[in-house]
Regions:
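N-terminal non-catalytic structural scaffold regions of very large proteins
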Residues: 1-150
Length: 150
């Protein structure tokens, strides 16, 4: 599994530090991300980081289950498991996967002069709509939930 992570998953990830100089990243509609609280190993400096999980990666990873059945791992779990390898100089204190659902209603006025242009604008707004739902696990860490919602 480590080999799959290093060769296929890790190169596709974007690691983002969140601080006053690096604001919270934009998460696309139905986008998933891993938020982490890390501590520098030799210092007490805290680092908050987000890994936006690319939609291009398959959500499930097939692993060898023998001849009789197939085994799969969830991509989010694999990334979370190897989080400490992504930041080797840090200790992983907390982590949480979340998913963003954005307002994707499309309103088109039939009497618009340029119907094609109206559709183009509506589709652009659809990708960047307001967040209407945040999906987290029930047992998620309250501190990390507060961090991503503020």
């Amino acid at each position: 599994m480590k080999n799959i992570f290093k060769k296929k998953i890790f190169p596709s990830l974007t690691l983002l530090e969140i601080d006053p100089a690096h604001p919270f990243p934009f998460i696309i509609n139905q986008g998933r991300a891993l938020v982490m609280k890390l501590k520098k190993k030799k210092k007490k400096r805290i680092l908050n980081s987000i890994i936006v999980i690319p939609k291009a990666l398959s959500r499930f990873i097939e692993i060898d289950g023998g001849k009789s059945f197939k085994k799969f791992l969830v991509l989010d779990d694999v990334i979370g498991y190897f989080a400490s390898e992504i930041f080797p100089d840090h200790l992983l204190e907390k982590k949480m996967i979340f998913r963003v659902i954005r307002d994707s209603d499309v309103e088109i006025q039939e009497e618009a002069e340029d119907l094609v242009r109206s559709f183009e604008l509506a589709l652009k707004r659809r990708r960047t709509g307001d967040i209407v739902r945040l999906e987290i696990l029930e047992k998620s860490d309250k501190e990390l939930v507060k961090f991503i919602t503020n």
